[in-house]
Structures are given as structure tokens and as C-alpha cells.
């Protein structure tokens, strides 16, 4: 009888582990929302192109009059400036007036991006922002931005890009997606423990 109970417990643990594995991508991307009119579009750093393309699309569709570009994490300030420059040049070539592009050269992580954007929102009188990033980044962003914006009267909406490499229900099939998911779970644990 005891061995049957042990087998049932092990089977239940295996089912739970498989379920967690199967839904890992969905859990990370679930906080993404639907874009709505806002005061600014924030294109987060570490962008391979999808974030800036999504920000441009939102701008062209009239969701906000400003685009804020954030810096590259863990990079020297001159590298951050160069990184911000290529994204700004892309936007200008696509028709965005340079006066509509703002820069955050000081953020070194998602938490900084949220805090620095909130400070800018307060200074400019913004009420809401659209935060653009990749789908598996959404869960951690919800933690960082939710904490920064809590009780401020300001709103943010997380808007996910649509990268070709991402399939939330089959994330393990793409090496890039698998690396992103594993990295995000490590960072998520860090955020939960630290902040």
C-alpha cells in the first residue's frame, strides 16, 4: 500500500513538473496588455530590433506623441549612447521627428527603467506610458513596473513585441527562446528575493 502511495505522489509530482514546463512561456508572457492611447511609448533596452519596430508601429498608429529609448544594461555609457543612436536613427529614417524621441542613458536594468520613466512622467505631467519589450520579459517587467508605479496615479501597459523566435507554448523549440525563458526565470527569482 505504501509503495502505491509513493508511486501516486511521484506521478503527481511528474505531472506538475511537466505542466510547469509546458506553461513556462505562457506564464512569463501573460502580463502583456493591449495598447491604448498614452503619453509616451517606452522602448526598452537590449533590443535586437523587434522592440523598436513595435514602438514605431505604435507611434505611427497614434498611440503616443513621444518615444523614450532606454539604454543597454550593464554597458559603459558611451556604448549606451551608440546603442541609443542606432535606434533613434532608425526612427528618424522612418519618419519620427527627432524632437519626439527622448533618451534614458542612465538605466542599467528593468527596475531602473521603471523608476527613471516614472521620474520623467512626473516631470512632464504624463499620466500613462506603453512599455515595449519581448514576450518572455513581461512577467519580470510587471513586478518592476508595478512596484515603481504603485500608488502614484500613473499607469503603464506592457506591450509585447511579436518576434519570429517566440512561441509561448513551444518555447523550447527555439534556442533563443529557451535561453530567454531560462534567463528570465533566474532573473525573476532574483527580483522576487531582492525587491
List the predicted regions and their residue ranges.
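A structural signal for short, hydrophobic/glycine-enriched beta-strand patches
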Residues: 23-172
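Alpha-helical structural elements
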Residues: 17, 22, 161, 166-167, ...
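N-terminal type II signal-anchor transmembrane helix
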Residues: 2-32
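A transmembrane-helix-recognition feature enriched in membrane-embedded lipid enzymes
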Residues: 173-195
Amino acid at each position: 500500500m505504501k509503495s502505491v502511495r509513493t508511486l501516486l505522489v511521484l506521478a503527481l509530482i511528474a505531472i506538475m513538473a511537466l505542466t510547469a514546463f509546458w506553461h513556462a512561456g505562457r506564464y512569463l508572457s501573460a502580463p502583456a496588455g493591449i495598447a491604448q492611447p498614452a503619453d509616451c511609448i517606452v522602448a526598452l533596452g537590449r533590443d535586437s530590433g523587434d522592440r523598436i519596430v513595435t514602438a514605431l508601429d505604435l507611434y505611427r498608429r497614434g498611440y503616443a506623441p513621444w518615444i523614450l529609448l532606454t539604454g543597454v544594461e550593464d554597458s559603459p555609457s558611451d556604448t549606451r549612447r551608440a546603442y541609443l543612436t542606432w535606434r533613434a536613427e532608425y526612427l528618424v529614417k522612418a519618419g519620427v521627428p527627432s524632437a519626439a524621441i527622448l533618451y534614458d542613458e542612465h538605466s542599467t536594468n528593468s527596475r531602473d527603467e521603471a523608476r527613471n520613466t516614472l521620474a520623467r512622467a512626473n516631470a512632464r505631467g504624463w499620466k500613462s506610458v506603453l512599455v515595449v519589450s519581448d514576450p518572455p520579459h513581461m512577467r519580470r517587467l510587471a513586478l518592476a513596473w508595478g512596484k515603481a508605479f504603485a500608488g502614484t496615479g500613473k499607469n503603464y501597459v506592457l506591450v509585447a513585441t511579436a518576434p519570429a523566435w517566440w512561441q509561448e507554448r513551444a518555447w523550447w523549440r527555439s534556442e533563443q527562446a529557451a535561453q530567454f525563458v531560462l534567463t528570465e526565470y533566474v532573473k525573476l527569482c532574483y527580483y522576487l528575493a531582492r525587491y
